[in-house]
Amino acid sequence: MTAKFVIPGEMRALVLDGTGFEHLQLRKVSTPRPGPGQMLARVDAAGICTSLIKLVEQGPNHQLVYGWDLERWPLILGDEGAVTLVEVGAELQKTYQPGECYVIQPAVDHAPINHPERYRDGGRGIHKVAVSYTLGGHLAEYILIPEEVLAAGCLLPLPDSKLPYSHAAMSEPISCAVSAQEHHMHLAQSNGLAERSAYKGLKPGGVTVIVGAGVMGRLHIELALSYHPRLVVVADFIEERLDLVKYLFGARAKRLRVGLMTFNPGKADLKAFVNEQSDYRGANDVIIAVGARSAIEDAMGYLGQGGVLNLFGGLKRGDEVVGFDTLAIHYKSINVTGSSGGSPWDIARTLGLMASGEIDPAMHITRIGDLEHAIELLKMVKAQQIDGKAIVYPHRRTGEIKAVQAWTAVDEKNYLSKQG
């Protein structure tokens, strides 16, 4: 039996109609209604992503906004979320049903289909659009799923109905780390006369260094353990973060027989430490999960033969040029890689890892709120006052932001069962 939903004429949404936080507001807008090839979904949970800060501060100048006039066509923000279909367009009713739960990959590799006239130069030459940018986002009570999302294969079903909304909403940021680690390519050769073979991912039995123990760095740690390196070294200047790393991942690392060590580069030399712990062979994989030029440049000093350097933490425009030791790259056959976001496959894999229990999003969630708190939460993220992910429930009203150490399926069920 097809589920029935009552859809209101208006909804609350976080809207950007210019450049800067003074142009960001929560307001009521008309609830979108889907055309024949579109769907409407209820937003069950949404994440507060750091990328929204850049969007707010750049407005129409952001590279994914393509010059839209935001005063005429405001954006609804929110690139992370979990949704339930509530209305399905006539052309899609044999494929989709109201009540089904999904997540949306926000990076949509497709040319604009809707409103090409709003894009710079009529949308010519544009091959990528994005949810939270020119496509409506998750920081609203409902979200329109347009043709672009479906054509690009960016609507992913939840593999397990028991998966909490908040955890499903975390699939996008986690998928970024999944994608990044899959960009690590290593060459193997059993002997000098054997043909080389290539494999992706971190080196099993090797030494992995993760620089930065913030929320994205911690996601990398959790995923890195699944590759079974011999040792994971986590570096950060903030002792509280290093203590948290040991608390969150120490038991799992021990269970997997993976060494887990933390290091404060403000107190001693990271290069010397890594070289000592690797028997002076250097690290096989280094992930830079901070936006710091020095961290990138210093990594050349402790990468080993055939090592991979992943530039996960981006640098600001104007500060993006770094100096590399080209002799180290040349003589040690070092690979330098990077990635920006994930693909639909990365989201699907992430959801599978969640469903199987191989990764646990609960430990990464530290703030809970509703749409009324979205702007405050975003400002807190900008001010680095939140060490973890913030989740918003658009259909749950609560008086204040809730600080948590973790957020489990039971926590979510209890929270959604009551108001206030």
Describe the residue ranges of each PLM region:
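C-terminal hydrophobic helical "lid"/dimerization subdomain
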Residues: T2-G9, A188, Y247, A272, ...
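Glycine-rich beta-strand-centered segment in the early N-terminal region that forms part
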Residues: S30-G47, N61-H115, P159
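NAD(P)H dinucleotide-binding glycine-rich loop of Rossmann-like/cofactor-binding domains
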Residues: G67, D109-L202, V207
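Hydrophobic/small residue at the entry helix of a nucleotide-binding pocket
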Residues: C176, M216, A224
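Adenosine-nucleotide cofactor-binding segment
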Residues: P204-G206, I210-A213, I221, L225-A295, ...
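Glycine-centered, small-residue-biased loops immediately flanking beta-strands
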Residues: G307-V308
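Rossmann-fold NAD(P)-binding glycine/threonine-rich loop
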Residues: G313-K332
